Structures are given as structure tokens and as C-alpha cells.
Amino acid sequence: MNNSLQSSKLVLLLAIALVLFLNTELDFLTAAGALDSDSKVYIVYLGEREHDDPELVTASHHQMLESLLQSKEDAQNSLIYSYQHGFSGFAALLTSSQAKKISEHPEVIHVIPNRIRKLKTTRAWDHLGLSPIPTSFSSLSSVKGLLHDTNLGSEAIIGVIDSGIWPESKAVNDQGLGPIPKRWRGKCEPGEQFNATIHCNNKLIGARYYLNGVVAAIGGKFNRTIIQDFQSTRDANGHGTHTATIAGGSFVPNVSYFGLAQGLVRGGAPRARIASYKACWNVMRDEGGGTDGRCTSADMWKAFDDAIHDGVDVLSVSIGGGIPEDSEVDKLDYIAAFHAVAKGITVVAAAGNEGPGAHTVDNVAPWLLTVAATTLDRSFPTKITLGNNQTLFAESLFTGPEISTGLAFLDSDSDDTVDVKGKTVLVFDSATPIAGKGVAAVILAQKPDDLLSRCNGVPCIFPDYEFGTEILKYIRTTRSPTVRITAATTLTGQPATTKVAAFSCRGPNSVSPAILKPDIAAPGVSILAAISPLNPEEQNGFGLLSGTSMSTPVVSGIIALLKSLHPKWSPAAVRSALVTTAWRTSPSGEPIFAEGSNKKLADPFDYGGGLVNPEKAAKPGLVYDMGIVDYIKYMCSAGYNDSSISRVLGKKTNCPIPKPSMLDINLPSITIPNLEKEVTLTRTVTNVGPIKSVYRAVIESPLGITLTVNPTTLVFKSAAKRVLTFSVKAKTSHKVNTGYFFGSLTWSDGVHDVIIPVSVKTTISM
């Protein structure tokens, strides 16, 4: 790993760090024991395909394995997957020495071990302005705006890589849908309790599942004790059903969650078609019992490969690798998404759930659309009345009859002599043992994390530490403390307001600090959508889940509408439209705060461009577009060598000398991580609005920074000249090192305000 080729590959994969995985975050666990103690699954990545014929691609993989193993039969038995559509590569059972040997082959870019990843979930569309909406397909004439202009996304195809789908869900009905788009090349695969003819329809048009990677990881056979799932696309976990129907679920009226959040449930693009790619499985935990959703790299890569072939418009991948590390293996694990984007498919990824610390954001590659999570303007307040008539409010999902009991305090040091049976218990630590104690309810005081749960059937209320301390003070000053708890209600609109969720991962980007991440934010807290009836959080086929896993398909659904309206837009143009038109205040005009250890006003490292605004994104005026040439510039600026880039792209590529600056990558943002004195960078915009337009620059400089734009006016005169370039000079007046300060650059024609965030940190050289 010390030669220059391997070093540049490390950087290569660092840039290719991407989005595969689901916001409900994933921990990396090396796949253990394949078919025997000496072999395990490795992924051999070969870059772009050398043949258009998939059979020839697969044949070349067999030849490479046969040459390595010196046996045609051994090569056939070793091969797990052939990646033949979107890119070239294969997964195979190899010993470590065989993996090392094949990595030295001149056609091989890299060899990585299979990895196992662990899954970590009504009002949203009203909140974002995609309303009013009819209650059935019989009154579509009342639909206006983006939904009307796109026929509710009826020609869009949303691919979802996740834990599968529950095909009987009401949210997957195809009422009112016309024929499947002719460009669709995918299929529905039959399997356990999944009949392709019966369960697929004009809504669920694709259903594939990928078992080979996870089966090889657990010993080579499907073991029902370990993999507690269906050998088909049917969803035992529920996560995949939830994310798919957030993005493209059909209308389902009069839905609630135990009486909360009642209303019409629908996806962002209610008439879009859904293709489910099941690469995540319910696997028994190593410790503690129960199951987790696990997804292996080999299975995920094959899902990407097929999705590229099938013809999806957008890929929603609510999976993530946790906080990025400078690991070549971890970065290469995401390269499949690059090939999807290169072929025009927008890949939407989760920012992660390890927030609110800085540098935690996941899926940081510039070709990914990375989504943070916000709250809705909706809450579920629960009234807590102490025995002294003091009243407090906290959120919960408690919907039962009023609780009136004694009140006690427990902590991790409490002994079994404390009598809590039949009482409501106050705890400050979720690890405090209460199981088997017969408590009536739990009040869990905690720092804000925006996560609500039904706590396995025990009523639980979630006040913050301040209110928890008030309750504790009452307990300690009262001989026989009591409490009354009233069922939660649903409150929408003010005073509830939009916040970046405490769990949502934050920037700056730890891998490439000049690339702003996250890109955008969307609702991801207590989102009501369809779910598998096998999920313990399910009620009548629906559930409330939270996470960047949920905000990711919100954006995917919006992109399905945008691609219906603008089918020729590139993934970069789509991202630009979303980022430059986003709300930087809540839809009601209130400030957007960022939850965390200390609440503050949200900035670009919390929410990127802001809260997604679907209607404005449909008509952005200008876009900051990017293509393969721009991604080559990024790879060159990140230090990739020519041969590595050439293999990834499938054609000979030479980096310019001197290498380009990462500051000049044509992103809809400007991030300068180390400004010493001054720097000049460039951006290019494409007019997608009226042919004859005049835009003027409006500058909001970060504190202590002077921004100068040249020219200050952009004049578009004809359809032949829709692309113009401008420069931005940033000059610091700070005399000491600083943290980041934030501003913005807006191009305005009086109708469109095209806003990009600006983030600058001054670094004084010694």
C-alpha cells in the first residue's frame, strides 16, 4: 500500500465516497466466514465496461477468475455476482492471497472485502407547499402547480434500494395509473410469498432481491434462524416500504397513527412508478437478541447495476456508512453511485443520524445529493400535571386513557428496594433498568433529539432536561408525589416551527472541505407512511418513523416530479434547482433553528442551501450544471492519477497541468476552508428560464470577508447563448484564524432569486 499507484487509488476512492446507503445509518462490520474459513467475498472493481453486451462483460469476468483459479469449475463456483450493466466488476469467494494476486492484475482498479451494513425513519407535503391535493383520482382538476404540471409524476420511475416492499400496502395501489412507461427495462422477480404476476402492478413495476452477498457472509446457506426474512422482495423490516411510499406512495385517505397525525397520506410523486431493489435483510444481532437490517456491499452493488440497466430516473438510497473515515475500502464501497450519476440518474443519499456534531455528515461525494433532516410544523404535545398542580408539556406518542399514578425517580444506581410498581417513573438515562418492574409509564428526560417512540407498549413521555429537573425537584420535596398524564394531541402550524433535527449529521465535509455537505434539508421527523405489518411500530399498515432515511425519499419524490417536468436536466441541474431555490426560513417565515447541545440559527453546514422548496425548484431561472468533465476536474484536484481516472471513466483521460482548483468545481455553493489573504474562483450558470433575461448580483458577505463578483450583471440574449461564466473574489480582513462565517450570492432578475450559500474560514499562515 506504499507505492504511488496505491496511494492515488486511496485518494481516488476518497473522492468517490458516495451515497449508497440509507439514512438510517449503517455501521461497518466486516463480513465473516464465507464458505470456509479461508475464503470470503471480495468485490473486484474494473471501472467502466469495455463491452456494451452484458454477456461479453460477464464472460470476461469468468475468464479473469478462471485464469486466477486455474479451473473453469472453480471460477463458476466462486462467482457471486457479475456487475455488467452500469459498470464492470464482480463479487467472488476468494482467499486473501487470491484477492491480493488479482488486485495486481493491470485491469483491476481495486479489490475490497464484502462489508455488512446495519440499518438504523401526511403533513410533510403540505408543509413544503405541494398542496392542495384531491382525496381521489376523480378530482384531479383541482390540483395545481408542480403536481398538476407533471400529472403527479406519472411518467417518473423511482428506484429504492432498501429492505424491499410490502406489496399489499394500500399505498402501493395502482388506481388511476396508465400503462407502464415503455422505456422501462426492469422486471418483477418471484420469490417467497411474492407472486410477480399478482403483486406487481402499474405502481410497483419492479421488484428484485439480492441474497448472495449476505448468505455468503453468514456461511453460504440461507439460515432462517440468522436471516429472519422472506427470500423475495417482500419486506419483513418495514424500512423499505416506508421509504418507497414516502417518495412515490399512492393516495390513502383517513390515515392516522393511533389517532395522531390524521389525514391523507401520499408520496411526493403519487403517480410515480416504484422499483424496489431489496439489498437489506433482517439478520439476527450478534448480541442482545432481536434483528437488524443488514446490507452487504456485494448485494448493494448488484442493486445499483440493475437499477442503471432498468431505467430509473432517481435512486433513493437511505443507507449510510456512518461518519466518513479516511479508509480506501470504505470510500470505494460507494463507487457504484458514480456510475449511476454518470448515466443521468440522480442518486439521493442520507446525511446520516450521528449529529449534531461537526464533521459528521456522510455521503460527501460531489455527485451525490445529500439530505439533512428537519422537523415539521407539527408536534404531539402531552400534558403532565404534577400533584402540586404544576403543568408541563412534553412530546410523546401516548394515546391511551389518562394516567394518574404515584411518581418515583430511578437512576442507574437505584437498587431493587425502590418500589415503582404501578407508578410513573422519571429517568434521565434510557439505559436505566425498568424492565420487569411493572411501571405504569416512563418520563424520559433527555437532551433534544426529536425522536419519539412508543417504548414497546409502555407509555413514555420525552421532556427536556430542564423540565425533567423540575419534575425531580417536585419528587424530592414531596412525601407522596403524584402525576397525571393526558394523551398526546396533534398540533400543526405555529408555535411549532421548522428545526434541523438534533440527530441530523452536520458539515463541514471531513473528506473534501471545499465541497459543501449536506446539500439540502427536508422533513425527516415523525413521518407517517406505509410500513410492513411485521414492524413493531406498525398500526393498520402505517407507522411514524424518523431519520435522514425519511428526509431522503422526500427529496427523491420531489426529484421524480422535476424529472417529469424537465426530463433532460442532469443530476447536477436537479441539485442546483433544489439548492438555489430552498427556503432559508420556514415556509411560514420564521427562522430555522438547528437543534443540538445549544440551539442556534441554522447555517449551510446544518441544512446546505436550506429547506427544499418544490414549487420554486421547478422554475429556478438559472442552474449551476455539471457533467463528466466537471467530475474529472474534481478527481484531478483531489489527486487521482490519470490511469485510475481513465479506468473509472472507461476512456483515456489526462489531468491538466497545473491541476484544477477544487474551489472551481461548478457547485451551487462556495466553500473556502482555508482563506489566507484572497482567492478568485469561477462559476458557470445556464439559463433555463426566459431566453432574454438580465440577472444582477446581490452579495451578502460573510463577517470579515469582502466578496466581489465580476461581472455584476449577466445578460442572456438568445437561446444560443444560455451559458455565462463569472468570477468571485474573496478577501479576508481577519488577522487571526477564525471559524467559518456565512453569507450568500444571489443572482436576481426580479422574478427568480438564484441563491447559493457562501462559507469561508480564514487561516493565517505562520
Curated annotation (Swiss-Prot):
Matching Pfam families = fn3_6, Inhibitor_I9, Peptidase_S8
Q: Which sites carry carbohydrate?
A: N195, N223, N254, N389, N641
Disulfide bonding pattern of the chain: none
User: What is its subcellular localisation?
Assistant: Secreted
What are the entry keywords?
Autocatalytic cleavage, Glycoprotein, Hydrolase, Protease, Secreted, Serine protease, Signal, Zymogen
- Record InterPro entries: Peptidase_S8/S53_dom, Peptidase_S8/S53_dom_sf, Peptidase_S8_Ser-AS, Peptidase_S8_subtilisin-rel, Peptidases_S8_3, S8pro/Inhibitor_I9, S8pro/Inhibitor_I9_sf, SBT
Q: Which GO terms describe its cellular component?
A: cytosol; extracellular region
Name all Peptidase S8 domain ranges.
134-618
Catalytic activity, EC: 3.4.21.-
Q: Does the keyword Calcium apply?
A: no
Q: Is the keyword Glycoprotein assigned to this protein?
A: yes
- Endpoints of the signal sequence: 1-21
* GO molecular function list: serine-type endopeptidase activity
Q: Tell me which domain of life the UniProt entry assigns to the organism this sequence originates from.
A: Eukaryota
A single Gene Ontology biological process assigned to it is:
proteolysis
Domain Inhibitor I9, by residue range, is 41-119
What are the positions of the active site? D162, H239, S549
User: What residues make up the propeptide removed on maturation?
Assistant: 22-120
Q: Which family does it belong to?
A: Belongs to the peptidase S8 family.
Name the PANTHER family on file.
PROPROTEIN CONVERTASE SUBTILISIN/KEXIN
UniProt protein name: Subtilisin-like protease SBT3.13
Q: Which organism is it from?
A: Arabidopsis thaliana
